[in-house]
Amino acid sequence: MTNALRTAGLDAVYLEGGISGWKDAGLPTRKKIGAVGDRWVTREHPKIDRIACPWLISRFISPLAEFIYVPANEVLAVAEEKRATPYDIKGAEFGHVGDRCSFDAIIRIFEIQDSALDHLATIVRGADTSRPDLTPQCEGLLAISYGLSANHPDDHEMLKHGLIIYDALYKWCRLQAEKHRSASKTAA
């Protein structure tokens, strides 16, 4: 699998101990979902959730996933035609529910447990649902997302650059979680 991922251009390393080693290290795992494939479709002209979700899917669910952006009125037809999973559209399983965004839905449905990812989800939710009061980083993500959109009118080009932004933001969230755990141990 490592070689297949490297061949696909992904920076993959072999984890000694496989999934057991992953779990023993306390790293997040996910629930297997039957009908979800490696092809996902959503509305064109992504900003926040429609870039955050592909990042989440490619980093935690399916590293070889393909993402398709189409006009909103074509999402369901393309999903059926291409056997793709629709996301971030009204009524989709992987869509907004209440005050939660599609990013939250994916985390919930796949049962991904990771404190850094929970922090990132709050940032994404605040930026995507116009609630910058959730955490100070929401406004920054919103600004970066609109800047990326203005710089990259091609959706896949924006996605390529957006993945780098989300990698960095997730790393920052992990560092914050580690700092919090260290402070808790010191206080104990």
Regions found by a protein language model. Give the residues of each.
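A broad, structural surface signal
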Residues: 3, 54, 58, 62, ...
